[in-house]
Structures are given as structure tokens and as C-alpha cells.
Amino acid sequence: MKGNEEHDIQKELKRYELFFKKRYKVLYTVNDFIIGAMFLVGSFFFFYDRLMSAGIWLFAIGSLLLLIRPTIRLIHDFHYRKHVEQQFKHQSSTDD
């Protein structure tokens, strides 16, 4: 019986992990795409004196978005760890 419960918990953790990996992977990819677009457009803006200050702003915002990448990863890890701890608490309470 205990082996089945562990198997069920492992299955639940895998399902949860896949759900959150997909969700955060989309956020991460969208963020990367926006960063790339900002740096590309900012680079072209540097060819024109009129648009140079807008290009600087795009670089600054793109750099800020680079800081969001590890933040997304930390939030994902925090939520996943929280879920794992809850599963193990649930498992230990049913073992008693």
C-alpha cells in the first residue's frame, strides 16, 4: 500500500512539474523575445541621430528585462519547492 502512495505522489509531482515548467518556459521565452526585439530596434535607432536617445532607453529597458530572467527562475523554483514540501507533509500525515 505504501508503495502505491509513493508512486501516486511521484506521479503527481511529475504532472505538477511539467505544468509549471511549461508555464514558466513560456514566460521565459516571451521575455527573451522582447529583450531581443528591444536590443535589435535599439541598435537600428543608433543609426539615426534623432532616434539615438530612444535607442538608449530601449537598451536600458532591455537590460532591466535581463534581470527578470533569474527572477522568473527563482519564482518557479519557489513554487515547485513549496508544492513538493506540501506533498511530503501530506504523505507523512497519512503514514501516521
Swiss-Prot record:
* N-terminal signal peptide: none
InterPro entries the record matches:
YrhK_domain
Membrane topology, as annotated, equals: Multi-pass membrane protein
Localized where?
Cell membrane
Any idea which UniProt keywords this protein has?
Answer: Cell membrane, Membrane, Transmembrane, Transmembrane helix
Q: Name one GO cellular component term.
A: plasma membrane
Q: Pfam family of this protein, just one? A: YrhK
Report the transmembrane regions from the record.
27-47, 52-72
What name does UniProt use for this protein? Answer: Uncharacterized protein YrhK
Organism expressing this protein natively = Bacillus subtilis (strain 168)
